[in-house]
Structures are given as structure tokens and as C-alpha cells.
Amino acid sequence: RSTEYTKASIEHYSKKWLEYPYPAATNVAGNEGGMEYPGIVFCSWESKGADLWGVTDHEFGHIWFPMIVGSNERLFGWMDEGFNTFINSLSTNEFNNGEYKDQPADMHQRAEAYTSPKLETIMSSPDNMKEANIGLLAYYKPSSGLVMLREQILGEERFDLALKTYIERWAYKHPQPDDFFRTIENVAGEDLSWFWRGWFQHNWRLDQGINSIKYVKNDPKQGVIISIENFEKMAMPVSLD
């Protein structure tokens, strides 16, 4: 099914973000786990099923990050692997009516690792990270941050337009992190400095709770005032139902 996976992956990214720029696409069964180059990728000959889809989709996703949007992966690995991991999650959920759809991540389970005070920040260059932390900091934490931004802060419509615009504006150029941050804010029409600061520039922890509940003028018929407090430094919107 390699050809099917290659076709579906490229068509998804071309339709959702920006058209695939090369006249051909080649997926080679090789000895390595997975590696990408312009127009050609290498995937393990042993991979099959969900594993083959995952590596094929991931390696072709790199055509968009960092080949079309030419970020400096040696300095900012998250703008390469993190962005690609994020768009892979959307592609996987859509492929063949959800054949390999991911289970929602348990962010409560991941939070301890994501916000450890011993962890370097996402903005650290990969060569300044402990090797054991590169997967988390370059792939998973930035991808989770984009999921939070899409699902909890901006909403799918605003976020998808903002990311598509970022790709279009910076295609075949070399953006820095601030170029990404400012483009998302510009298109979304919202100051997100509080989010970039907490999730990307620091490892701030999210801990929110209800501080107090009071009736308006002590009269339940007039409604209730609920006060929410941040017990840690990270901020996030809260919905009360």
C-alpha cells in the first residue's frame, strides 16, 4: 500500500496547506527507519500497516517543513519536526476515513514531563538538549502546543487559516520563531504572547482551579460569580458549563 499512502499524504497536504512542488514523488524501501529529501523519501522495508503509513506520512510531511518553509532545523528543531508531527496528526485522522486515527492524547499524563523544571525549553537548539529530551522537545511538546492552540484557544477555522498563511508567506524563505509567532497573531487577530512565553520560551506549568463561588447579592436568582485562579504561571482559557 506504499503508493496509496504516498498519494494520500501528498494530496492531503497539497489541499490543506500548499501544493506539492515537485513533478514526482518516490518512496524507497530502505534499511533506515525513515529519512526525507526533496521529492524522495526512504522508509524501512520492514514497515507495514499503520507503521508504514506513519513513516510515509511523516517523511513526506517534511516536504512542507522544512523544505518549503525553510526553517533552520539545526537551531530550531521544533519548527521542523514539531510542525511536521502536528500536520501528521491531522493527515492521519483523515486518511481512509480514519483507518489509523489516533486516540486523543492524555495531556494530564504528559504534563509532568512537558513542564519539568529540569527540562530544556522548546526554543533551545537540539545540540543544547540532552539527547533523551530531543524527541519530546522537538516533536511532541511543540505539536501538543499547536493542538492546544487549535482546539482550545483559536478554534480550528482561525488556526488553520493562520497556519496556511504562514506557509504561504514563508514558502521558500527562512523564517525565525518570531516570524511564526507574529504571522499567527496577525492572521488570528489576537495577541498570543502569553501562550508563546509559557509553552515555547519556558516550561511553565498549568494549574487552574475555582477560588470562590458567590451568589450575586446573596440571591441565587440573580446568578453566580465564579472566580478562577492560576496557581502556577501558565495561563489558558477556561470554559465553565
Where do the protein language model's features map onto the residues?
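Extended low-complexity, serine/threonine- and proline-enriched intrinsically disordered segments
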Residues: 238-241
